[in-house]
From Swiss-Prot:
SUPFAM superfamilies membership: P-loop containing nucleoside triphosphate hydrolases
Role this protein plays: Transfers the gamma-phosphate of ATP to the 4'-position of a tetraacyldisaccharide 1-phosphate intermediate (termed DS-1-P) to form tetraacyldisaccharide 1,4'-bis-phosphate (lipid IVA).
Annotated region described as Disordered, given as residue ranges: 343-367
Annotated transmembrane regions: none
Protein name, per record: Tetraacyldisaccharide 4'-kinase
Amino acid sequence: MPVPRHALADFVTAQWQRRGWFAWAMLPFSLLFGLIARVRRHGYQRGWFKSTRLPMPVVVVGNVTVGGTGKTPAVIALAQALTEAGLRPGVVSRGYGVELKHPRRVKPTSKASDVGDEPLLIARATDVPVWVFPDRALCAQTMLVSHPGVNVLLLDDGLQHYKLQRDFEIVMFDSRMGGNGLLLPAGPLREPLSRPRDATLINDPNFRATPDRPGMYGMRLELDDAWQLADPTMARPVSAFAGRRVLAAAGIGNPERFFASLRGAGLTPKTLPLPDHYDFVADPFVDHPDALDADVILITEKDAVKCERFDDPRIWVVPTRPVIDAGLIEKIRRAVLAQIKPAPTAPATTPGAAGRNEEHRDGQPAA
């Protein structure tokens, strides 16, 4: 049997959506966590800790909540949009769950076990340099040596990585927004909802940007045709699986988002939620009763990069196409072009971590 999503983790996640006994019991620890986070952030802003300024604009895509909000598809969409705008973006990520001794380039032929599932997905979906290492500043500097033509950096999931100065911050949420609005461990927040940012991006198909909420934009994930894992040349619409016995499996931060999208396409799948970044070293389908009974097994692109060794014609991969409000794309493009210098110099380590262009900060709360 596969490793199930941890019962304790599911319990805590559910508690984070309300202000019940758990939230109040954890509140003293949240106050301490908030104090430490505030001191750390202000310490970088005031120059108490060293940070690195790159010779190019840095756009950060991250979240103030724990868990997946759709950052990877957002980075993919932004990389594609900036490339279409004539810019030359590069992407730096941490490489979650991978032990790295030095910065490593992610190629489309890389293995997820060597570079991480999300960076590999970005590398395969875009034609931009992608590098991984926990020290994002060093990683970016190393990338620039190999790719000196890069003139804008996308920092994947680096909102709290203040060692690298930034020029534009995007804070992402999904339909869960900020939960109960409390900091860890009483709630899901790493930082307060009121944290300043340049833009708020809501990954929710029902969200609509309106003039009374400036700085807030929407993103939706549209299902593309599914392709067969054993033979990627085989493709068909997801709706073609309607009426079949379908098992949907997902090892992502919010599996229910994937399951709901399949239901929206007319499917009634059995579901198998797996831990985020599940490594698929053990085959979760080999003795699972719903898998044994299924005609079709649907998985995400993020999981597919770790399932390539599986030889099961029932497994189909469901890609998603991220669509971001054009207003955010244009706002980022203007901010980036305003920062690009004609003759960049070598990156340098300087005191002070904010390094942010306050002209673009709107301070818009998320909720």
